[in-house]
């Protein structure tokens, strides 16, 4: 089995009165991990720990087997370890897209530098626009340049913290598809914070769900959708995880005056359910049960 590109071990961080416990996790080359969770959950804090901006309270982050050094120990973050794409680009507007990418490759011989830039221009679909000043490019193209720039030194890890949040759906989807392909081709690891769970399901090999400063569930997207560990996690995918069915059955279908939603993950295990009533319908028998405060229909 390949060495993890990223390995976090017993990772925690404290800030004022807030404490974050991220525990253990790893990302392998060729994988895309997406962080999901509500605002303020700790996604950006975890990204800053991965990048080396913050010192952990406990634990460590390793990139390709080597511990990540923090900004306090070195003046400049090591971009050969992790490429970083911020939400708002930090490109030089007067330089061309190509010059912005090449700026991080000044130590290479000219021929090698030009070949590397050509490869990144193709990977990010910037052909024909790489000679334009970035101030003349659209927001989507600028972010493509930012991704190419982040990958200029061929780091084993790409980090993107809501870098595509300002883009329209079509542009964002197109970029995510190209990022996924680049990750596979280059066999790097990518960790992204995305706002929309639909985007996460499209691109992620793994999902890490962050809530209240903790990594509460991680795994393949399809596994988390099928078996979320809490109502809050199920709610992230409510467009696909709510059981969309109704039945014209007499009786009270409200609890404390409010309608109750039923999530798919609640169906398989109904231990301790209380039988309230049973009905015979043309399509078969139904049982009305109470389980964990919910009134449910069960065939």
Residues covered by each model-derived region:
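Non-catalytic connector elements of ABC transporters
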Residues: 44, 250-299
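Helix-to-loop junction immediately C-terminal to a conserved catalytic motif
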Residues: 51
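ABC ATPase NBD coupling module
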Residues: 67-83, 107, 224, 228
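Conserved ABC ATPase "signature" region
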Residues: 112-129, 180-181
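Conserved ABC ATPase signature
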Residues: 133-137, 141-143
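A short, proline-enriched helix->beta-strand linker immediately N-terminal to the Walker B motif
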Residues: 152-156
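Conserved ABC ATPase "signature" C-loop
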Residues: 212-213
């Amino acid at each position: 089995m390949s060495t993890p590109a990223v390995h976090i071990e017993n990772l925690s961080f404290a800030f004022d009165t807030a404490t974050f416990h991220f525990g253990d996790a790893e990302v392998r080359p060729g994988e895309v991990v997406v962080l999901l969770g509500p605002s303020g959950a700790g996604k950006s804090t975890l990204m800053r720990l991965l990048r080396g901006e913050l010192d952990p309270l406990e634990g460590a982050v390793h990139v390709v087997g080597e511990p990540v050094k923090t900004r306090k120990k070195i003046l400049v973050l090591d971009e050969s370890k992790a490429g970083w794409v911020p939400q708002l680009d930090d490109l030089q507007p007067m330089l061309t897209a190509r010059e912005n990418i090449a700026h991080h490759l000044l130590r290479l011989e000219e021929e090698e530098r030009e070949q590397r830039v050509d490869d990144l221009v193709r990977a990010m679909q910037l052909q024909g626009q790489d000679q334009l000043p970035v101030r003349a490019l659209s927001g989507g193209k600028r972010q493509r340049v930012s991704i190419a720039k982040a990958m200029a030194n061929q780091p084993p890890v790409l980090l993107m913290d809501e870098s595509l949040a300002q883009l329209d759906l079509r542009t964002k989807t197109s970029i995510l598809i190209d990022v996924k392909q680049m990750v596979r081709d280059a066999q790097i690891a990518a960790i992204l914070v995305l706002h929309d769970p639909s985007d996460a399901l499209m691109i992620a090999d793994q999902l890490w769900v962050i809530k209240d400063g903790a990594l509460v569930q991680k795994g393949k997207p399809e596994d988390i959708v099928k078996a979320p560990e809490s109502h809050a996690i199920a709610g992230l995918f409510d467009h696909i995880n709510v059981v969309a069915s109704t039945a014209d059955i007499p009786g009270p279908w409200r609890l404390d005056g409010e309608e109750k939603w039923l999530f798919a993950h609640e169906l398989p295990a109904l231990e301790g359910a209380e039988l309230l009533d049973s009905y015979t319908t043309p399509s078969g028998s139904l049982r009305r049960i109470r389980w964990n405060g919910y009134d449910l229909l069960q065939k």
